[in-house]
Amino acid sequence: MAKAPVRARKRVRKQVSDGVAHVHASFNNTIVTITDRQGNALGWATAGGSGFRGSRKSTPFAAQVAAERCAEAVKDYGIKNLEVMVKGPGPGRESTIRALNAAGFRITNITDVTPIPHNGCRPPKKRRV
């Protein structure tokens, strides 16, 4: 007896007008995640996942490409306004914000959420090259 054909349900994209872009800029890579106001991830991209490897991952251009790819991934949600949360000291901090602005989003707020210890863990020793 043949099974009845299974219909694939078309996933309905919810419409979100305001979003939050979380930018994690480390010295080695840049991760861009766009969420709704509640923190549910809508799309993400990384410099490494955008085709950059090794030391090219940690460039401002790689961060810009990652931000463009992330913006492309969430454009179906209808986001118009973005709040940007930047974390980390990496080279991709500024270029991601510029790329998100150029992608057509209206940036309403930029917040630096880099964690700063109140004299917590001992930092790693200095590099000797």
UniProtKB/Swiss-Prot annotation:
State a single Gene Ontology molecular function: structural constituent of ribosome
Keyword DNA damage tagged: no
An example Pfam family from this entry, by short name, is Ribosomal_S11
Supply the InterPro entries for this chain: Ribosomal_uS11, Ribosomal_uS11_bac-type, Ribosomal_uS11_CS, Ribosomal_uS11_sf
UniProt record, GO biological process:
translation
Q: Name one GO cellular component term.
A: ribonucleoprotein complex
> Sorted alphabetically, which keywords does the UniProt record give?
Ribonucleoprotein, Ribosomal protein, RNA-binding, rRNA-binding
Record PROSITE patterns: RIBOSOMAL_S11
What the protein does comes down to: Located on the platform of the 30S subunit, it bridges several disparate RNA helices of the 16S rRNA. Forms part of the Shine-Dalgarno cleft in the 70S ribosome.
Subunit structure, briefly? Part of the 30S ribosomal subunit. Interacts with proteins S7 and S18. Binds to IF-3.
Cross-referenced NCBIfam families, in alphabetical order? Answer: PRK05309.1, uS11_bact
Q: Name the family the entry cites.
A: Belongs to the universal ribosomal protein uS11 family.
Q: What is this protein called?
A: Small ribosomal subunit protein uS11
The gene for this chain is: rpsK
